């Protein structure tokens, strides 16, 4: 039987969501002005199937050969460095506008005689000051495989785009009684610096009498500060814009006397331009701060694209606190 690969990349964000309204209008008009999303866990699933109608068959169908072939395939995914480039992300003036990825539903496998689905998660926990990757057998349908080789390696970089170096290898082999739904492993890293992080996962599954095959997926970069706190994802539901991300994780501090100034005139000019561009949201602007995506402290400027309006409590209690640990 030929092993058929069907790679399902399911991005699941476990989010703490707070919706803030702040205009002096009615309650209905205040709601949904801004959405603050704080990702905690990012998950992907990989599903490998074996088709009962497959025509190809391994000439060495004993378990030892299947396991050996699976290990060889797993070793081919060993990369000390990976390169990331998102053609839809707009990077300009030290900030990156990253398009929001919509959640995709997992596809069914009506012709699959047997399948195994693996769950790969990356957990950012600022309380433990850790970043953890996990590997878990999510489901098994039909005959269980005799071997599963799985890995969920962590990579980091100082830039959103470009080369990422491996932080650690997290590889696991499932054999015999370990091949059961719910069996999982985890590995943690305790960052000391702000970085962009990516995880790359690989699954190799082999059934008796089949040729093992492999499936690989990579999670898009996520910016986390030195305590593992993910950069907040905030959407302005009036302008339909999501707050950009700083393009680097290692911007140096600019001396106070060298920083660009921010005055009440600059603030007024921004508000006028915002209304001209997006229309009047009828907000109580006195209750808002205008946030610099790249702060003046790190070389940010007063250009329109580097500015983002925020309720004062979010600006001071979320963004400023995040940057305190940059």
What is each stretch, according to the model?
Residues 1-2, 208:
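Accessible peptide chain termini
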Residues 2-25:
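Sec-dependent N-terminal signal peptides of Gram-positive bacterial secreted proteins and lipoproteins
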Residues 28, 33-289, 297-326:
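Nuclease and nuclease-like effector domains acting on nucleic acids or nucleotide cofactors
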């Amino acid at each position: 039987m030929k092993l058929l690969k069907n790679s399902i990349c399911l991005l699941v964000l476990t989010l703490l969501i707070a919706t803030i309204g702040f205009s002096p209008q009615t309650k209905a008009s205040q709601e949904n002005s801004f959405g603050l999303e704080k990702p905690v866990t990012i998950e992907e699933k990989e599903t490998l199937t074996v088709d009962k109608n497959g025509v190809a068959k391994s000439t060495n169908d004993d378990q030892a050969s299947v396991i050996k072939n699976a290990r060889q395939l797993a070793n081919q995914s060993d990369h000390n460095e990976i390169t990331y480039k998102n053609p839809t992300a707009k990077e300009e003036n030290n900030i990156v506008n990253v398009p929001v990825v919509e959640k995709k539903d997992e596809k069914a496998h009506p012709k699959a005689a047997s399948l195994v689905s693996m769950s790969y998660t990356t957990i950012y926990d600022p309380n433990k000051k850790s970043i953890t990757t996990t590997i878990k057998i999510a489901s098994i349908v039909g005959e269980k495989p005799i071997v599963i080789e799985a890995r969920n390696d962590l990579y980091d970089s100082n830039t959103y785009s470009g080369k990422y170096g491996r932080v650690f290898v997290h590889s696991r082999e499932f054999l015999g009684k370990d091949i059961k739904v719910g069996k999982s492993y985890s590995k943690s890293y305790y960052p000391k610096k702000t970085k962009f992080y990516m995880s790359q996962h690989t699954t190799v599954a082999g059934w008796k009498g089949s040729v093992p095959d492999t499936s690989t997926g990579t999670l898009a970069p996520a910016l986390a500060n030195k305590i593992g706190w993910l950069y907040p994802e905030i959407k302005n539901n009036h302008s339909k814009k999501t707050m950009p991300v700083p393009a680097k994780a290692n911007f140096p501090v600019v001396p106070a006397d060298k920083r660009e100034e921010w005055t009440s005139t600059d603030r007024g000019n921004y508000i006028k331009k915002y209304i001209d561009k997006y229309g009047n949201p009828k907000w109580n602007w006195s209750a808002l701060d205008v946030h610099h995506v790249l702060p003046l402290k790190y070389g940010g400027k007063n250009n329109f694209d580097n500015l983002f309006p925020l309720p004062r409590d979010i600006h001071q209690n979320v963004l400023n606190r995040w940057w305190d640990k940059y």
